[in-house]
A protein has these predicted regions:
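N-terminal small-domain helix-loop-helix segment of the aminotransferase-like
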Residues: 2-7, 15, 19, 23-120, ...
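Conserved core segment of the aminotransferase class I/II
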Residues: 4-9, 13-15, 255-339
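Well-ordered, non-membrane alpha-helical segments in soluble/globular domains
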Residues: 28-37, 65-69, 177-178, 208-220, ...
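Short beta-strand
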Residues: 48-50, 85, 360-366, 395-398
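Short, solvent-exposed loop/turn segments at secondary-structure junctions
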Residues: 54-58, 122, 146-147, 198-201, ...
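Conserved core of the PLP fold type I
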Residues: 79-230, 237-258, 413
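PLP-dependent enzyme catalytic core of the Aspartate aminotransferase-like
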Residues: 98, 102, 182, 259, ...
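Conserved glycine-rich beta-strand-loop-beta hairpin in the small C-terminal domain of fold type I
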Residues: 334-349, 360-374, 400-402
Length: 432
């Protein structure tokens, strides 16, 4: 039996692409008229005393221990120990939306939601899966891809996890993307696809021409009457090292593509602003067919996923990021770090362009934190272990044929030796 509040949200979403794509769990989700909502009312109208929220308060200010204050002297108690709102700090959400529009000018006249703040990008992907993925609604992603996609889809949601071949001998394999998406649409009546650029593990971002082709693939499926959820995992957005890369997110092109397309953008300062451990991410969504009431209803669905899991995200992290964004030196400092990553990329590019291997073939890469090798003749896990044991170099085995190297975490003066060691050990292994 559905809660009446869930029924009300579902009624608002009736006839929309959201309703067609929602999982069973998504249909059950609602935001209770409980502590949070009643506390919100009291925050506005309880002028004498507020006995709603479980915090220790003195003179209308959360009590903060001196041991905390000494560590964060520039933040006030509401920015350190108080609970933050379920969907995140309103000011920070507005700032992130402004930044999103600045980085994606094609969104200027398109209706998109106010970004919802979540505890990191993994949480963002997990909440999307909660609302839209289940045992009858599989998730589609690239092969190779980040292993957390399969963990979220299969282990958490009990769903099937399907993949398309990300690359062929020519580069980005758009033919297999189209083929697989159309097969999914025909079999299940709808498609849920994660498109992650810059891609993890390969470090590849599509060109302007490739983005137009991806957009056409999605639009063709939508025009056939099938619903498509396009989840843009933009964790490494903007870290581009070649001139022909499309500078905007796929989300900018999907946001009002068709009434049958629901576009969701998962992003945040984690990688873009070098704030990995702050665990602050954002979810933004859009669809040509959604009215404001339906946008509000889907936002409430996401808030219910947050409320029923972590309740709210870390207050200090949000406060620190908000103040950093307001610091005029922030973008300058970020640009310097991006230049450092670019230099590391250039060194890796120079090495792989001037060295050959009968075992290792670099997958296409032009952006992000990583590059990866297609491994032939040997197992990538065996190579990983040998490189670690013999040279003290850590890399990641994604699958038996894919080895990932995060050049983002390797000092410039060590890059040539690291890659030479990987190549040399790989060649030695096939001659043993």
């Amino acid at each position: 039996m559905l809660n009446p509040l869930a029924q009300e949200l579902n009624e608002t979403l009736k006839g929309s692409v959201v309703e067609a794509l929602m999982s069973d769990m998504g249909k059950r989700m609602y935001f209770p008229n409980g502590i949070i909502s009643q506390g919100g009312e009291a925050a506005k109208d309880a002028y004498f005393a507020n006995g709603t929220i479980g915090m220790a308060v003195a003179e209308k200010t959360p009590i903060e221990l001196d041991s905390y204050k000494k560590i964060m002297p520039d933040l006030n108690p509401r920015e350190t120990v108080a609970y933050e709102k379920t969907a995140g700090n309103p000011e920070l959400r507005k700032i992130w939306k402004d930044k999103l529009l600045e980085k994606n000018p094609s969104l200027k006249d398109k209706q998109i939601s106010l970004p919802i703040l979540v505890p990191g990008l993994t949480a963002a992907l997990s909440y999307v899966a909660d609302l839209f993925v289940d045992e009858n609604k599989p998730l589609l992603a690239a092969d190779p891809c980040w292993d957390n996609y399969e963990l979220i889809a299969c282990a958490r949601r009990g769903a099937e996890f399907h993949q398309f071949k990300c690359f062929d001998e020519k580069g980005l394999n758009l033919a297999d993307l189209e083929k697989t998406m159309k097969e999914e649409a025909e079999k299940y009546g709808s498609v849920r696809v994660i498109l992650n650029f810059p891609q993890n593990p390969s470090g590849y971002s599509p060109t302007k021409d490739e983005v137009q082709k991806i957009t056409k693939i999605v639009k063709d499926i939508a025009e056939s009457g099938k619903q498509v959820l396009v989840l843009s995992d933009d964790a490494y957005f903007g870290l581009n090292y070649e001139d022909d890369i499309e500078p905007q997110s796929l989300f900018a092109y999907m946001a009002d593509l068709h009434e049958n397309v629901l576009a969701i953008k998962a992003d945040g300062p984690t990688k873009e602003d070098f704030a990995w451990g702050f665990r602050t991410g954002f979810l933004t969504f859009a669809s040509k067919g959604l009215n404001q009431a339906q946008i509000d209803a889907l936002q409430v669905k996401f808030m219910s996923a947050i409320r029923s899991s972590v309740s709210c995200s870390s207050t200090p992290s949000q406060a620190i990021i908000k103040h950093a964004f307001m610091n005029p030196d922030h973008d300058t400092q970020k640009a310097e770090l991006r230049k450092m990553l670019h230099r590391r990329y250039d060194l890796v590019r120079k090495f792989v362009n001037t060295h050959t291997s009968s075992v290792l073939t670099p997958l296409p890469f032009n952006s992000g934190y990583f590059m990866a090798f297609d491994v032939k003749k040997i197992d990538a896990e065996d190579l990983r272990k040998r490189v670690l044991a013999e040279k003290g170099i850590g890399v990641i085995q994604i699958n038996p044929k894919t080895l990932r190297v995060a050049f983002s975490s390797i000092d410039e003066e060590k890059i040539e030796e690291v890659f030479a060691s990987i190549y040399n050990i790989a060649e030695a292994m096939i001659s043993e």
